[in-house]
């Protein structure tokens, strides 16, 4: 493991006042990918694509290949060619950073070491000249929060710091990772044209119900004027990781043993899975769609083929329409003297696995979990809030996280919410263009509002004077 270099702490004296550094670096520290980059120096950029060009998605993991080579962070996406039997070490578990030794190595490799940083736009040359915005999942344990504060402010010595947390001391906490989404231009997503005019100073949406379905879990966060309502936060311990593991189990029981092929099966999931809006109909199509023997029917059937990657041939995996005659074609090819390369093709035939795997997000009881699905948990979240706020939140449901990209996810969520919500409420469910980096984008807009950032962030001087316990109270809204 690479050593983390201690950062100098004597540059700024505690004896005189210190303001937040001008540069702000945001790290949305996800369990699967980190979303990181510098915020713009002045007013927020109106063009979302240009603003997101400053944000890089970096694997938050250390991997070991079957050739016993180790890759860290950004190296994974550029240097790895053989994904078979890849071993992953992730510092974030269940949404919380629990292994700071691994996390420090990934950060050092991705942001501090000039030799390994992907680009100069991600390089942090002197942390004392940078304010860092660091996100974490709601309701983290105090010990984990303290670890983050001490490592970021004492080992690296950043000049300014904001840890986006949910506070327990007040019903309106300062910030959470999900609440950063409220700082984006939400109105245009919900067709509120009167309110969607460009603003010189970034400000949060008034009412927003954030559904964050990511790698480790799904979290429902009601956000009021940029601040999360603590008692309304609900969590479903199902995320993309669980979908991948479930798909691995199903495929391993029915076809090849894919238990050790986590990365490959994650690629399969992202390529072929979808959320069914008529489960019984799709289940019937699975076994009836290709019932005419010898005649492939890709238009009616749900069944598809996924060709597994071939690292020796430098080929990536891909999905294609199911060919029920594939076996007989291969036998004929052998008789015709086809080359080994043409025949050496491993194929997964996927039918009901395509939609039964994502179905657990809506009916966790399918895998024995005694929990409600996402739509019911949204209603549970609203049930503890004033009734007068329900229409505003249901009319502004924002879905972020990688699972929202599954085809059919948005339609299914909106349909089920309409069925169980009050008839008087208008239900609008929207997803931004980039649901994975949307929280980072909100953080960058917050960073351009210098006055608001001063209220919620702390300086290095304040940390040195008051310590970690004071920092925890500050970020929890107790000060």
Curated annotation (Swiss-Prot):
<keyword id="KW-0156">Chromatin regulator</keyword>
<keyword id="KW-0963">Cytoplasm</keyword>
<keyword id="KW-0805">Transcription regulation</keyword>
<dbReference type="GO" id="GO:0000812">
    <property type="term" value="C:Swr1 complex"/>
</dbReference>
<comment type="similarity">
    <text>Belongs to the actin family. ARP6 subfamily.</text>
</comment>
<dbReference type="GO" id="GO:0006338">
    <property type="term" value="P:chromatin remodeling"/>
</dbReference>
<dbReference type="InterPro" id="IPR043129">
    <property type="entry name" value="ATPase_NBD"/>
</dbReference>
<dbReference type="GO" id="GO:0005856">
    <property type="term" value="C:cytoskeleton"/>
</dbReference>
<dbReference type="Pfam" id="PF00022">
    <property type="entry name" value="Actin"/>
</dbReference>
<dbReference type="GO" id="GO:0005737">
    <property type="term" value="C:cytoplasm"/>
</dbReference>
<keyword id="KW-0539">Nucleus</keyword>
<keyword id="KW-0804">Transcription</keyword>
<keyword id="KW-0010">Activator</keyword>
<comment type="subunit">
    <text>Component of the SWR1 chromatin remodeling complex.</text>
</comment>
<comment type="function">
    <text>Component of the SWR1 complex which mediates the ATP-dependent exchange of histone H2A for the H2A variant HZT1 leading to transcriptional regulation of selected genes by chromatin remodeling. Involved in chromosome stability.</text>
</comment>
<keyword id="KW-0206">Cytoskeleton</keyword>
<dbReference type="GO" id="GO:0031491">
    <property type="term" value="F:nucleosome binding"/>
</dbReference>
<dbReference type="InterPro" id="IPR004000">
    <property type="entry name" value="Actin"/>
</dbReference>
<protein>
    <recommendedName>
        <fullName>Actin-like protein arp6</fullName>
    </recommendedName>
</protein>
């Amino acid at each position: 493991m690479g050593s983390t270099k201690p950062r100098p702490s004597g540059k700024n004296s505690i004896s005189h006042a210190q303001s937040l550094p001008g540069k702000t670096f945001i790290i949305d520290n996800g369990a699967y990918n980190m979303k990181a980059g510098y915020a713009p120096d002045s007013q927020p950029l109106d063009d979302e694509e240009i603003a997101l060009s400053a944000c890089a998605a970096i694997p938050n993991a250390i991997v070991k290949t079957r050739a016993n080579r180790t890759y860290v962070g950004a190296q994974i996406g550029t240097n790895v060619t053989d994904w078979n039997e890849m071993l992953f070490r992730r510092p974030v578990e269940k949404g919380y950073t629990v292994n700071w030794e691994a996390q420090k190595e990934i950060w050092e490799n991705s942001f501090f070491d000039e030799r390994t940083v992907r680009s100069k736009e991600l390089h942090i040359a002197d942390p004392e000249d940078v304010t860092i915005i660091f996100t974490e999942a709601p309701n983290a344990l105090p010990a984990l929060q303290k670890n983050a504060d001490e490592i970021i402010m004492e080992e690296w010595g950043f000049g300014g710091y904001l840890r986006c947390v949910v506070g327990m001391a007040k019903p309106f906490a300062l910030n959470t990772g999900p609440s950063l989404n409220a700082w984006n231009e939400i109105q245009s997503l919900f067709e509120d044209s009167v309110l969607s005019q460009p603003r010189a100073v970034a400000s949060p949406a008034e009412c927003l119900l954030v559904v964050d379905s990511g790698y480790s879990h799904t979290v429902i966060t009601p956000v009021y004027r940029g601040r999360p309502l603590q008692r309304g936060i609900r969590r479903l311990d199902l995320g993309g990781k669980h979908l991948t593991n479930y798909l691995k189990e199903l495929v391993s029981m029915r076809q090849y043993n894919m238990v050790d092929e986590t990365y490959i099966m994650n690629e399969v999931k992202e390529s072929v899975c979808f959320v069914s809006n008529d489960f019984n109909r799709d289940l019937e199509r699975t076994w009836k769609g290709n019932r005419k023997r010898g005649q492939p029917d890709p238009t009616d059937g749900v069944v598809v083929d996924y060709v597994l990657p071939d690292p020796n041939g430098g080929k990536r995996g891909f999905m294609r329409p199911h060919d029920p005659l594939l076996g007989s074609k291969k036998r004929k090819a052998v008789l015709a003297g086809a080359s080994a390369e043409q025949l050496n093709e491993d194929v997964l035939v996927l039918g009901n696995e395509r939609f039964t795997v994502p179905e657990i997000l809506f009916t966790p009881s399918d895998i024995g979990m005694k929990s409600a699905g996402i739509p019911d948990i949204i209603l549970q979240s609203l049930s503890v809030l004033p009734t007068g706020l329900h229409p505003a939140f249901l009319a502004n449901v924002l879905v972020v996280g990688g699972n929202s990209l599954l085809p059919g996810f948005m339609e299914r969520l909106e349909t089920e919410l309409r069925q169980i919500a009050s008839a008087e409420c208008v239900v609008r469910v929207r997803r931004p263009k980039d649901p994975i980096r949307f929280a980072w984008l909100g953080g960058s807009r917050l960073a351009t509002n210098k006055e608001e950032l001063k209220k919620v962030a702390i300086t290095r001087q304040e940390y040195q004077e008051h310590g970690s316990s004071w920092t925890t109270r500050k970020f929890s809204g107790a000060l």
